[in-house]
Amino acid sequence: NYGTYVGKMDILSSLSTLSFDKRRSKFFTDELLILLKLIDTNQIDYKTLYGSWAGAFGFFQFMPSTMKNYAIDFDKNSYIDLKNNNDAYASASNYLNQIGWNSANPCFFRISYNNWQVVDLPLVPVIPIVIGLI
């Protein structure tokens, strides 16, 4: 059911509320400010900003900082719309390209469990990725 449900929360309200949470106030405040800047510069349409409770938006659930750094207005309609296939896929492709993903590397591994037992495997990422505020 890809794309049929991308969240129903107003992400402006979500980020505003979460910016007051002491545990991650700086992160969510920064995300809120980035979102407001994207709206102010007419890069995104504020009327379409419904997503997750944490402020993620679109088919690929981009946070505002990810939108700012990687989202593309592929269909050239003057707005980045991550609920539009053209913009969403172009943005996801740009994101993967910019973080160094190589199409020659596998994106998943086939695994199996004997008798449904949890197995502790020493898995390491194929591509080391630094996770943090983008």
Show where each model-derived region lies.
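Catalytic glycan-binding domains that act on GlcNAc-containing polysaccharides
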Residues: 1-134
